[in-house]
C-alpha cells in the first residue's frame, strides 16, 4: 500500500516524466513514465490525486507504486 499522497503538478507523456506535489510538503517528487505504465496507466493528469511510494535510485528520489485515488 502506498505511503504518500499528492497531486500531479504536471506530466508530459512525450518527454516521459513529470512531478507530483506531495500533500504537506513543498518539495516536488519526480515521476517517470515507467512508474506510470507499471501502474497500468498511460499518463497522469494535472491536479490528479495519487498515492505513491518514494524510491531512491542512484541518489535520486522518485515516485513508484502509483495508485490513482
Predicted features, each with a name:
Residues 1-5:
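Short coil-to-beta-strand transition motifs
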Residues 11, 53-57:
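Short beta-strand micro-motifs enriched in acidic
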Residues 13-15:
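Short, conserved beta-turn/loop elements at beta-strand boundaries and strand-helix junctions
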Residues 28-39:
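Beta-strand/loop nucleic-acid-binding surfaces
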Residues 37-51:
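Short nucleic-acid-contacting surface segments enriched for D/E, G, S/T with interspersed K/R
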Residues 56-69:
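OB-fold/S1-family single-stranded nucleic acid-binding modules
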Amino acid at each position: 500500500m502506498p505511503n504518500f499522497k499528492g497531486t500531479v503538478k504536471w506530466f508530459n507523456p512525450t518527454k516521459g516524466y513529470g512531478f507530483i506535489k506531495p500533500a504537506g510538503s513543498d518539495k516536488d517528487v519526480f515521476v517517470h513514465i515507467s512508474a506510470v505504465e507499471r501502474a497500468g496507466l498511460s499518463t497522469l493528469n494535472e491536479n490528479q490525486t495519487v498515492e505513491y511510494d518514494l524510491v531512491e535510485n542512484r541518489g535520486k528520489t522518485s515516485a513508484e507504486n502509483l495508485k490513482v485515488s
